[in-house]
């Protein structure tokens, strides 16, 4: 078996060509650099990052270019203090050995830094105090003179006259005054109007009041009638009936209101009596109750027509429309009416 494996191995290897010999290749030449390779810094050598300094000279940490703190006389471990102490005892007047620096002279006429000079009677401060008092007096004189000059200049200046307004400005002012005091002008005009006999004037006012009351009631009835006919033509008979019920409530309300105003002629007692006997504020409540009971009882049992709440309320507020028309008529009559001429007596009183 070993012989067979050797024969198979030798037969499978390719033959070596005769033109190539084993010694025909030349060796590769390696050229090394002349410089030495740099090593990584370990922080131990002088000058390296984290290493010791390159020189052994002491560094000047404090004061920049000043003396070295190790050799200065301020440290307690200085060994050369004996010579300095001997010089201090031998010649105490030497200024070079004085540790305290010389102070500059304080500015001003009085030095508060030296407290002992104030307690001493030998120090004469009369000149400084006299000069300060003179300066204060001089400043006061200057201020008084300047104030006097200002007052004289104000007195000499000519008085300022108000300019007359232009026509447009006067019209604007008149309109603003009329808008602000329009009601007061009318009131004063009525007060200045000459009055006749009080009884005759009261009778005229009473007659005018009754005319106005009857006019408002007739106007309410007329507007309500027009609304009732319009509701009957445009809508259903049920809506017309509801509007008519509200119109009746409106007429009742106006009647009660007129009676309350009539009671004011008797004074406070009449006002209280009229307010108690004429509960006109309950009229809309009564209308709502009639609407509820009518639809709940009369409609299902007796077959009456159904009522609507909104037409009833519209018919009730018919008196508001009549009052509004009456107010517009009064405003138009006041604006179109020319103001009556004022008598000479009232003009003289003005």
Curated annotation (Swiss-Prot):
Location of the region described as Disordered in the Swiss-Prot/TrEMBL record: 7-58
Any single Pfam family the record assigns to this protein: CGL160_C
InterPro entries for this protein: CGL160/ATPI_dom
Single GO biological process annotation from the record: chloroplast proton-transporting ATP synthase complex assembly
Record keywords, A-Z: Chloroplast, Membrane, Phosphoprotein, Plastid, Thylakoid, Transit peptide, Transmembrane, Transmembrane helix
One of the record's GO cellular component terms: chloroplast thylakoid
Modification sites for Phosphoserine: 117
Range of the transit peptide: 1-46
Transmembrane segments: 213-233, 239-259, 276-296, 304-324
Disruption phenotype: Reduced growth rate. Increase in xanthophyll cycle activity and energy-dependent non-photochemical quenching.
Bias kind Polar residues: ranges: 7-26
Subcellular location per the Swiss-Prot or TrEMBL entry: Plastid, Chloroplast thylakoid membrane
Keyword flag rRNA processing: no
Lipid bilayer topology: Multi-pass membrane protein
Annotated S-S bridges: none
Domain of life: Eukaryota
Presence of the UniProt keyword Phosphoprotein in the record: yes
Family annotation (PANTHER family): NF-KAPPA-B INHIBITOR-LIKE PROTEIN-RELATED, PROTEIN CONSERVED ONLY IN THE GREEN LINEAGE 160, CHLOROPLASTIC
Entry function: Facilitates the assembly of the membrane proton channel of the chloroplastic F-type ATPase. Specifically required for the efficient assembly and integration of the CF(0) subunit c into the chloroplastic ATPase complex in the thylakoid membrane.
Protein name from the UniProt record: Protein CONSERVED ONLY IN THE GREEN LINEAGE 160, chloroplastic
Naturally occurring in which organism (per UniProt): Arabidopsis thaliana (Mouse-ear cress)
């Amino acid at each position: 078996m070993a012989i067979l494996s050797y024969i198979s191995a030798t037969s499978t290897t390719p033959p070596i060509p005769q033109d190539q010999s084993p010694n025909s290749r030349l060796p590769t030449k390696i050229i090394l650099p002349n410089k030495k390779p740099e090593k990584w810094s370990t922080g131990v050598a002088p000058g390296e990052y984290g290493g010791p300094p390159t020189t052994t000279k002491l560094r000047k940490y404090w004061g920049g270019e000043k003396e070295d703190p190790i050799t200065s006389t301020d440290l307690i471990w200085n060994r050369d203090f004996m010579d300095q102490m001997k010089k201090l005892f031998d010649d105490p007047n030497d200024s070079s050995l004085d540790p305290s620096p010389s102070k500059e002279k304080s500015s001003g006429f009085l030095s508060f830094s030296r407290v002992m000079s104030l307690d001493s009677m030998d120090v004469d401060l009369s000149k400084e105090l006299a000069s300060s008092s003179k300066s204060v007096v001089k400043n006061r004189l200057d201020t008084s003179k300047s104030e006097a000059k200002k007052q004289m200049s104000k007195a000499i200046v000519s008085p300022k006259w108000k300019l007359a307004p232009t026509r447009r400005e006067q019209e604007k002012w008149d309109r603003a005054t009329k808008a602000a005091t329009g009601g007061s002008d009318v009131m004063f005009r009525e007060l200045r109007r000459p009055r006749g006999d009080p009884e005759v004037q009261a009778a005229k006012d009473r007659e005018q009041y009754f005319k106005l009351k009857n006019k408002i009631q007739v106007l309410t009835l007329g507007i309500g009638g027009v609304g009732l006919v319009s509701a009957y033509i445009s809508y259903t008979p049920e809506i017309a009936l509801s509007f008519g019920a509200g119109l009746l409530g409106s007429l009742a309300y106006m009647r009660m209101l007129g009676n309350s105003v009539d009671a004011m002629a008797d004074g406070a007692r009449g006002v209280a009596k009229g307010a108690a006997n004429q509960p006109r504020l309950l009229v809309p409540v009564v209308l709502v109750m009639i609407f509820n009971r009518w639809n709940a009882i009369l409609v299902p049992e007796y077959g009456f027509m159904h009522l609507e709440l909104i037409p009833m309320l519209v018919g009730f507020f018919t008196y508001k429309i009549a009052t509004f028309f009456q107010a517009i008529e009064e405003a138009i009559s006041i604006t179109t009416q020319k103001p009556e001429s004022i008598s000479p007596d009232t003009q003289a009183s003005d």
